């Protein structure tokens, strides 16, 4: 390529004085339209601006007039120089043909000027930047829209900060960059405005070749083609990889690069298309894990497509379909897969909870009776039930109290002593026949067995069913109410140990049944008593075996000692009742099996244990108390029958 030919063409073009209308839009298409003759148009584009600079700053200060038109002869003198010598440092020094145009346009290199241009890829903006250094300040120019960093440009002019900021703020078209490398920060202004500023401040020659239109050609100087081609290729490769946009330098005469340049003009729309391709993956990554984590245990196997569809429905807000699919999967898999709290519907949970009580019919019926009716209603209902049976007239009243007492917990061994009297021993022994009578049949007399045959079925069923659950509530009332009255030590001293020993015999041996109910109101039972609470714990533990009549051994033990501490707790104090409960547990361990001697006459070993426990002041063990009850049962029953 002959370097002289382009220069001649330039000068002939300028001598004709041809001018082209100025395009004010700072777009790259402005330069693309000038490329078909790539080296002819740039010089004449700004030729008409020489005579009319028309430039003024915001502070009404105007720069001197533009450079006088004596520069073209100087450029003519430069025409003799074909190529500027390349410096030894390897910096790119192009031929004079690359700097055509007047000096005010920045197209022609000053005499002896060595253009220094570097190109870097501005990754944040996705554009290639050409950088020119002047006075130690780097001024950058974008390759895509030719905008120039006006802040750095005015810094080269030595302008104060206030004046510089005022000028840049008055610009209509500007792009503020606050993030990135230091030499790229600032206010970016269009190419024409930057050239005007440079001409007013007389820094156009200092900034050469910043304003050269085909500044990219400076990087492709034939003498330095190998290095510059590598730099540009690397820059464009990075730009293509990161942003999917490939754009050739504007000034390349190569047809291939020119073709790429025009074909990739709609490159900015391709930028959003690239992230949009990756967006569905991001959405799935953010939304898909949510449904499986909450319903993976019951939703069963689910394809990937179904999972993505589920998540997309949730994202779009159509919750109906997703919830339906989840519910159906729950219903189908609930039978075969274990339900977890996170996914089990509340309805199925409630049903499963309600299914347990019917296993024990007595417990279920007692619980319903306890919940549905008050204590007094249940008592009168029990009166009607027992009055219908062939018993004495007073039997319903006492059976009610006995039923209430037995409700509190398994009955004590007191009825074994009363079993001598066939008719009156039934109410207290209703529970005993179920518990102790089973565990220790030898402790009952023949008359007691007859009574069992007559009344155990109907009485034991009721008391067993209600004792299992309701007994503790009613018994708390009885035990607490017996304390404030005169039932403490007097019943035992008066020869009626039944009241003190067992809470179930209190109505018979104490006051009349009417006074028994009126004095000891069942509507407002005070509940703060350690013995009753301890007894509740023990009775609740053992009501299952007693009510269902499962294990005879433990059922009998539960019946005998559980009521004893409460019965004797009424005598000394509340604390004795609780301590009696502790001794009761100890005696249970000692008993193991019940004594097989007859109820009226227990062995001497039992008598010694009775003496020991009575001296301690605590509640009597079940065998000892059984002996005590057996001795005084006839008198107590007779007194109750006289009432």
Swiss-Prot record:
One of its GO terms (cellular component) is nucleus. The gene is Asm-1. Residues 583-612 are annotated as: Nuclear localization domain. GO terms for biological process: conidium formation; sporulation resulting in formation of a cellular spore. Belongs to the EFG1/PHD1/stuA family. Keywords: Conidiation, DNA-binding, Nucleus, Sporulation, Transcription, Transcription regulation. Residues 13-33, 306-335, 350-367, 471-481, 529-551, 563-577 have a biased composition (Polar residues). Gene3D superfamilies: Transcription regulator HTH, APSES-type DNA-binding domain (3.10.260.10). The lineage of its organism: Eukaryota, Fungi, Dikarya, Ascomycota, Pezizomycotina. Residues 336-349, 368-391 have a biased composition (Low complexity). This is Cell pattern formation-associated protein asm-1. Transcription factor that regulates asexual reproduction. Binds the StuA-response elements (StRE) with the consensus sequence 5'-(A/T)CGCG(T/A)N(A/C)-3' at the promoters of target genes. Required for rapid conidial germination, normal vegetative morphology, and protoperithecium formation.
């Amino acid at each position: 390529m002959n370097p002289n030919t382009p220069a001649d063409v330039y000068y002939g073009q300028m001598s004709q004085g041809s001018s082209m209308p100025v395009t004010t839009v700072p777009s790259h298409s402005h330069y693309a339209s000038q490329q078909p003759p790539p080296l002819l148009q740039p010089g004449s584009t700004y030729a008409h601006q020489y005579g009319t600079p028309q430039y003024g700053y915001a502070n009404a200060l105007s720069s001197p007039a533009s450079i006088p038109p004596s520069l073209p002869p100087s450029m003519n003198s430069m025409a003799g120089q074909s190529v500027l010598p390349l410096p030894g440092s390897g910096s790119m020094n192009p031929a004079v043909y690359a700097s055509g145009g007047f000096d005010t346009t920045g197209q022609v290199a000053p005499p002896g000027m060595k253009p220094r241009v570097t190109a870097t890829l501005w990754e944040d903006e996705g554009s290639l930047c050409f950088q020119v250094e002047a006075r130690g300040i780097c001024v950058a120019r974008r390759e895509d829209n030719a905008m120039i960093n006006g802040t750095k440009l005015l810094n080269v002019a030595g302008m104060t900060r206030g004046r510089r900021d005022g000028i840049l703020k008055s610009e209509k078209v500007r792009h503020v960059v606050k993030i990135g490398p230091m030499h790229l920060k600032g206010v970016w202004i269009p190419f024409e405005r930057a050239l005007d500023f440079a001409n007013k401040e007389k820094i156009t020659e200092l900034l050469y070749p910043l304003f050269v239109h085909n500044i990219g050609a400076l990087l492709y100087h034939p003498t330095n083609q190998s290095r510059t081609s590598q730099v540009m290729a690397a820059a464009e490769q990075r730009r293509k990889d990161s942003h999917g946009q490939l754009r050739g330098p504007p000034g390349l005469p190569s047809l291939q690069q020119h073709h790429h340049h025009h074909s990739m003009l709609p490159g900015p729309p391709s930028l959003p298309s690239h992230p949009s391709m990756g967006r569905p993956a991001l959405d799935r990554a953010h939304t898909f894990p949510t449904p499986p984590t909450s319903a993976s245990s019951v939703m069963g196997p689910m394809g990937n497509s179904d999972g993505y569809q589920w998540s997309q429905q949730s994202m779009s807000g159509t919750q109906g379909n997703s919830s339906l699919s989840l519910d159906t999967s729950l219903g189908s898999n609930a039978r075969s897969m274990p339900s977890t709290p996170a996914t089990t519907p509340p309805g199925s949970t409630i049903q499963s909870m309600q299914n347990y009580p019917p296993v024990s019919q007595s417990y279920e019926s007692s619980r319903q009776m306890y919940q549905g009716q008050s204590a007094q209603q249940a008592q009168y209902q029990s009166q009607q039930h027992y009055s219908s049976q062939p018993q004495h007239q007073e039997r319903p009243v006492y059976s009610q109290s006995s039923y209430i007492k037995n409700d509190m917990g398994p009955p004590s061994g007191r009825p074994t002593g009363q079993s001598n009297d066939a008719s009156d021993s039934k109410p207290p022994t209703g529970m005993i026949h179920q518990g102790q009578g089973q565990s220790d049949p030898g402790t009952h007399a023949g008359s007691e067995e007859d009574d069992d045959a007559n009344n155990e079925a109907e009485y034991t069923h009721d008391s067993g069913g209600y004792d299992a659950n309701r007994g503790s509530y009613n018994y708390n009332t009885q035990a607490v109410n017996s304390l404030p009255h005169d039932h403490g030590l007097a019943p035992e001293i008066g020869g009626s140990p039944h009241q003190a020993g067992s809470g179930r015999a209190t109505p018979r041996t104490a006051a009349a049944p009417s006074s028994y109910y009126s004095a000891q109101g069942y509507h407002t039972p005070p509940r703060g008593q350690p013995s009753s609470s301890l007894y509740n714990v023990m009775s609740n533990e053992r009501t299952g075996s007693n009510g269902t009549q499962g294990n005879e051994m433990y059922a009998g033990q539960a019946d005998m000692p559980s009521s004893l501490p409460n019965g004797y707790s009424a005598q000394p104090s509340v604390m004795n009742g609780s301590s009696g409960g502790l001794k009761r547990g100890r005696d249970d361990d000692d008993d193991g099996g019940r004594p097989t001697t007859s109820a009226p006459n227990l062995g001497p070993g039992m008598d010694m244990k009775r003496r020991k426990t009575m001296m301690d002041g605590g509640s009597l063990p079940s065998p000892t108390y059984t002996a005590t009850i057996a001795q005084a049962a006839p008198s107590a029953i007779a007194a109750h029958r006289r009432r």
